Amino acid sequence: PYRAGPQARQAETTEVDKMLKAGVIEPATSEWASPVVLVPKPDGSLRFCVDYRRLNAITVRDTYPLPRMDECIDSLGDAVVFSTLDCNSGYWQIPLHEADRDKTTFCSHAGTFRFLRMPFGLRNAPATFQRAIDIILSGLKWRTCLVYLDDIIIYSTSREDHFRHVDEVLTTLRDAGLSLKLKKCHFFKEAVDYLGHVIRPGRLEVAEKNTAALKEAKLPRTQTELKSF
């Protein structure tokens, strides 16, 4: 494992314990091993990540495409009511094939473990998840909902239709065994944040959080500052 201070080691151990209890990982003895990386979050806490760069370098790329964001947003043009859903730890809801689990082994200060569910950081994780969610919602996608990875938006031209559309999507997800992060779900809204934009009936705006940094940036005064602006 990479060198880490007491705070980082504690954060690492806490996350390992959490994943063990959730059935996401298990102890492992493997010829594969990737190091843990703890990435600082804006709030000062640490995000647990595994550095899979070596594994990704020898992984054959899955070319399954992600949806075009502009096409997703354009499809919402006539809608007047929206609901957004967030899959609970989305990638973890995809089980790993037994033959591939050892490849995900990571070494930490708490020992070596392998994933039983698909972890973040794998080269093909986005394509794998997108394919799975597209198959699950194939009968509803582009008709009542749009899906970009674990972000789902349900859209309708009337509140009456929206009741039915929300029920169809939630029932389909439940039948597929997928769970949602309720605190990040929003229902029956006239304006929602989706893919970095605020979606309203007949209006589209860039989300404030995506323009704040540009608005607060100081104007460059030298050639060097201009190049990095």
Regions found by a protein language model. Give the residues of each.
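Retroelement reverse transcriptase polymerase core
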Residues: 1-229
